[in-house]
């Protein structure tokens, strides 16, 4: 089981690490921190890693947060590798040091969250 992260989040939250890969040139960035967020419809990737992978942002969308604040986000196409599974797709960019894995990926996995003990795992 993996520990929740209490350094970035209060209260502590489930944080995973992933690998991001540019599908065109094969460049990879490893150990990217990603919040596991069952309340998020979509997955968001930290913009700094997309830049390091030489990815070109394409379409722009308006996003709404849980409190209905609106923001604009561009997308990139890449491979996100999480727990040995590769998810190919178009992902939103976020300007922070961690990303968010939303239900567009989480719904393909069998996860267990143990909030009391601040642990999570894939079954």
Feature annotation, model-predicted:
Residues 1-123:
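Pepsin/retropepsin-fold aspartyl endopeptidases
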